Amino acid sequence: MRFKGLDLNLLVVLDALMTERNLTAAARSINLSQPAMSAAVARLRTNFRDDLFAMAGREFIPTPRAEGLAPAVRDALLQIQLSIVSWEPFNPAQSDRRFRIVLSDYVTLVFFEKVVARAAQEAPGISFDCLPLADDFEELLRRGDIDFLIMPELFMSMHPHAALFEDKFVCVGCRTNEQLSEPFTFERYMSMGHVAVKFGNTRRPTIEEWYLLEHGLKRRIEVVVQGFSMIPPMLSGTERIGTMPLRLAQHFAKTIPLRIVELPLPIPPLAEAVQWPALHNSDPASLWMRELLLQEASLMVSPRAPVRLSAPGF
């Protein structure tokens, strides 16, 4: 099919190459043979009068011209998919939709497991692909490669989003850690060894670390882990402490001997929100899933302040 001299099928080829950066993988993703894919690349280069891709080993490296074309091509294909190809009434009871959702281990344990349980009742054919927090979430949203992103609202981009729930940060340590006795001061917090969380390949710090860095302060980090759920096991039998959301600390305190105390830092509450690609704003399946997320979030009880909290039996 041609539109003003351009074979529109070539746009699908260009999008696949931008995604896969490999000729064989791109051909497989759109069900073309490798010779047909090579011929399509040649036609793309002729049409746009640019090489579009340079070879580096087996990887296709896009030229500036290809980089400039890619966002418009992806947006056009998504609009066609959502507005024409996929547009139909959404029946959750009969749907086999698979949602791709980026979220943290914390959100999974304190919130999303309830969402999955409810979805199993209302939409048994629906499935979920839960992905770890990524450094390129803005690109994933722009390209429509994910359906939802759940993370602190503070870090969200300009795509549409909605607030889910709030939590507060607390300090945790082993039940036998006497340094967590009251009053637990800021000076003591800074003097102790910490188990800290850093996310993604770029090792992005958490909110409390941002607060300390902005005030020119540096704590003694002795262990770095990839998620909040890894903090409690690293504290057992040590004098180290960790900073994590209260809901998750209470979750682990049921099975791990933890002591939970107020965090001596004036940091704001942790406000979790859900974000989705702007192009999915009117997608019936996305609308249904958003409503389910918001309903489950509204059922969450606000966490109580840990005046002197610990595991049972302390």
Swiss-Prot record:
Q: What are the GO MF terms of this UniProt record?
A: DNA binding; DNA-binding transcription factor activity
- This chain's protein is named Nodulation protein D 2
User: Which InterPro entries would you find in this protein's record?
Assistant: LysR-type_TF (IPR050389), LysR_subst-bd (IPR005119), NodD_PBP2 (IPR037416), Tscrpt_reg_HTH_LysR (IPR000847), WH-like_DNA-bd_sf (IPR036388), WH_DNA-bd_sf (IPR036390)
Keyword field = Activator, DNA-binding, Nodulation, Repressor, Transcription, Transcription regulation
Highest taxon listed in the record's lineage: Bacteria
Q: Coding gene?
A: nodD2
**Which PROSITE patterns does the annotation name?**
HTH_LYSR (PS50931)
Entry function: NodD regulates the expression of the nodABCFE genes which encode other nodulation proteins. NodD is also a negative regulator of its own expression. Binds flavonoids as inducers.
Q: Which residues bind DNA?
A: 23-42
Q: Does the keyword Repressor apply?
A: yes
What stretches pass through the bilayer?
Answer: none
Q: Which residues form a coiled coil?
A: none
Residue span(s) of domain HTH lysR-type: 6-63
Pfam families attached to this UniProt entry: HTH_1, LysR_substrate
The text of the family note is: Belongs to the LysR transcriptional regulatory family.
